[in-house]
Amino acid sequence: MGNLKSVGQEPGPPCGLGLGLGLGLCGKQGPASPTSEPSRAPALAPPPSPPPAPDHSSPPLTRPPDGPKFPRVKNWEVGSITYDTLSAQSQQDGPCTPRRCLGSLVFPRKLQSRPSQNPAPPEQLLSQARDFISQYYSSIKRSGSQAHEQRLQEVEAEVAATGTYQLRESELVFGAKQAWRNAPRCVGRIQWGKLQVFDARDCSSAQEMFTYICNHIKYATNRGNLRSAITVFPQRASGRGDFRIWNSQLVRYAGYRQQDGSVRGDPANVEITELCIQHGWTPGNGRFDVLPLLLQAPDEPPELFALPPELVLEVPLEHPTLEWFAALGLRWYALPAVSNMLLEIGGLEFPAAPFSGWYMSTEIGTRNLCDPHRYNILEDVAVCMDLDTRTTSSLWKDKAAVEINLAVLHSYQLAKVTIVDHHAATASFMKHLENEQKARGGCPADWAWIVPPISGSLTPVFHQEMVNYVLSPAFRYQTDPWKGSASKGAGVTRKKTFKEVANAVKISASLMGTVMAKRVKATILYGSETGRAQSYAQQLGRLFRKAFDPRVLCMDEYDVVSLEHETLVLVVTSTFGNGDPPENGESFAAALMEMSGSYNSSPRPEQHKSYKIRFNSVSCSDPLVSSWRRKRKESRNTDSAGALGTLRFCVFGLGSRAYPHFCAFARAVDTRLEELGGERLLQLGQGDELCGQEEAFGGWAQAAFQASWETFCVGEDAKAAARDIFSPKRTWKRQRYRLSAQAEGLQLLPGLIHVHRRKMVQATVLAVENLQSSKSTRATILVRLDTGSQEALQYQPGDHIGICPPNRPGLVEALLSRVEDPPPPGEPVAVEQLEKGSPGGPPPSWVRDPRLPPCTLRQALTFFLDITSPPSPQLLRLLSTLAEESSEQQELESLSQDPRRYEEWKWFRCPTLLEVLEQFPSVALPAPLLLTQLPLLQPRYYSVSSAPSAHPGEIHLTVAVLAYRTQDGLGPLHYGVCSTWLSQLKAGDPVPCFIRGAPSFRLPPDPSLPCILVGPGTGIAPFRGFWQGRLHDIYSKGLQPAPMTLVFGCRCSQLDHLYRDEVQDAQQRGVFGRVLTAFSREPDSPKTYVQDILRTELAAEVHRVLCLERGHMFVCGDVTMATSVLQTVQRILATEGDMELDEAGDVIGVLRDQQRYHEDIFGLTLRTQEVTSRIRTQSFSLQERHLRGAVPWALDPPGPDTVGP
């Protein structure tokens, strides 16, 4: 803390937010301007010795060639020279004149803020507002955008109408951080981006002020792990008094004037102590009595509030080797929180904006305890040390001061309370200067305040010239509220009675923690392909509403630049395909990868490569990331905070361990948010759909909720709320739901667009053809669709098409027969839910559920709701409450609560909802339950099997028709929802669909590069588009591309050799050089798979194409095949390239980064059941191991011998 004033308040704030934040300007040069004279070394410093040769690593000497002159700034220690161009942006003159330097004044009158009877002229306010708004939009890289211009117009209109304007919350956050960044007297500014801003502009009374302040202290103290924070109360308004905090700091020790003129306690606080006594405080008589707060609402007298003792963390001081030191009875408080300075942002003034950081040890050890006008313990300590105090040449003052500072550091570290020594603080400031020179071209700094009170030239800042000037936003000193024109409403008429004081203390205790819950905003982002992540995010939103102000957004609805101003973000996301983001998360992913701070805090510069590839390659186990994390932890308070310095975050990933890159996108988002400076509140959660995903999410959500309310101090009863949300005894409440008749019926295509939130169009069937032999027991079909040349259905070979199928009519009718009290068959309905009212708020009301469009119950079950997937444990819990037979109720409860039993039941039976109802016939089935609790029927994705150049206006699909029996082949027959529907279509039938691009699975632009294509079964689908496109290039464009190699696999040459004639024709026309086929069930032949072909016949070619000719390899098929092919290729590269297996793995990683090893992986098939069972067993063992001693949602990543990454 800065300690330069002997009477009245102490002017300076903490190290975490600066050594003083004062604004006295260096008078050697007058106000900072383009014409300022070059700065010189401090006048009282000794003449510098000849500087050493400049360090070649220092910034080069770069004076702007033309235009105005800028201050020349030299570092006398290393000889480096820079020019402060930022000083040209200063709009305010300093206090100095050409004949007088006032730079050493603590409170230059010219720079103190005083309440004015007349508001600032609109032109002046508008000028400052425009400058600030431009700063803000430049910071988010939107300068000159339509949003920027629109915001300027809004501010101008508001000023014209009201004479002032209001900041948006994001602008307030930015402005508060910039004010800290611009504070010339602050040595700890490297952490400016980590300032937590609490918006208290809705405060209306002194009691509410106290509530905010208590929560500020609790949050910032954080049990000794201090966090920088600011609470901003309402701005100054014309014709109204100010909100003011009379105390100079939120925590201060009283100073009692004695009859002999001496002071017991802190002499700096005598005046505020006497004011507190006048307002009814009953003082103690100790040296370290914590003062109450005097808080003033506009035009009201100040009110007295005593801080609850449990809120103020204090540190008893002891010495590591001098045992007698503890007997001195010294102590100091942990949290330095300046409360009497004014915050100015864009011309708006906030007279009450307390801010806090952490101490630099010399603020306590040298200034507070040793200054003659403070506690003045220097000589007492020197005597105890047996030092000669009779002569200054014994340096007794210096020796005693060092030991006192050592005691302070030792005591705070022993108590685990954040503190920084002056050497570390000044070294971090030098790094901050370097950062700011690169980012802004300069940094305002007051040399007299930056250099610490001891060690002078032993610190690097002593040798650094500095330029002092005023930038906006800024912190400013202001006159005491009980003096002069600021004293309106401050008169003291009487002392408060004991009862009134007791009531004030009672209010102090009761108000703590009651407001923050409504004020801390939480943003919940989801990325989802199937809707499950969205459902989980909505559950999370309901949970966080118990203690926060949450909003739930899809990633594609969220502006990523808002992350810099967020307080708490929770991410729930799935991973699509080959480790990619879900489609509605792609824009978020790209923007997140492009984000950087003022100084990029990433562990390494980003290379120019696909963000999808980057997401697949980032992991928490990355050694570079681990090294960066370790370094960041060691220098938490002395290093740059990063772009997301104030963000706290938690991430949960959904996935399946059957797929490579399990939860890859979630892991990458988790790592990237930390790289950008965010603080992880909870380790990454992962939910495996093969084993206990719902339980994993429930456990993670409760843990995330607890970590969040502990971090933001929003109330101790939040844990009970979490248990209520995820309680296994939740019941279906019929009275909370109803169906309402709707006038308008369903239009299918707009309805699908509403449900899936994506653009969708309708294609028409041209033909459906079975590609397998009539002797085959299975079917694979070629579906030809007419696109009508619609722009929305334009595609490239390798892309995917999404199809929205209906459920089978027979299944729908059987389910309808089980619904109790259904609505009339042809009547469109909507579900309405009874929203609870709140005390003082709106009464209970019926609100329509927006998930589905108005439609009949039959239409909902046919087109929008998933009735074939096994019901989730949550749905089974609800069904158990609707069962009339107690035995069925108990069985359903057991299934819903025992994860292992549920997974075994689901895996063996794979039951549809109808089969569950047949197994538990006493369950009643309300229509609203179906419409609100069933998951959405998701689109099915297929690789496009054609090229637009070969078949204009058409899209072809290659689809395996799925039919199988559950229960080891003895259960009911199940059909693939989409494949069965497609197989039954006739020419002219409509097909709702959309295109999903796959830019990472396309032939290289250079046709001369060799390519190897590997695709068994329907994995050949995208390659048909490849060869059709190449044929078109050969015959229409005259190109001569390099012949490709195709490796295909099927069961039997006479049954399911798909597209054999087409492939042979393409080979004869020069598209393929080699075509090899693996038969797994060919009579009188051994089983052969595509990976066997690669190993036995193509090993040399694989190595040559990938390592020597910069060629490409494409793999398409199910997850088991793709993993086996990958392992085979790795072994081939190791053998043919004479390298270790790990080295070959690194080569494949490079190939993926270069987008030369491509994978198009689709879901589980019947053939993968054995492998999937093994993965489920591994998942169960992981879960059980964690249940014995850890948490089920933080599953370990699979080992190198498992199918997962």
From Swiss-Prot:
It comes from Canis lupus familiaris. Belongs to the NOS family. One of its GO terms (cellular component) is Golgi apparatus. Its EC number is 1.14.13.39. Stimulated by calcium/calmodulin. Inhibited by NOSIP and NOSTRIN. This is Nitric oxide synthase 3. It holds the Pfam family NO_synthase. Residues 44-54 have a biased composition (Pro residues). Its cofactor is heme b; FAD; FMN; (6R)-L-erythro-5,6,7,8-tetrahydrobiopterin. The modification Phosphothreonine is found at residues 497, 1177. The modification Phosphoserine is found at residues 116, 617, 635, 640, 838, 1179, 1181.
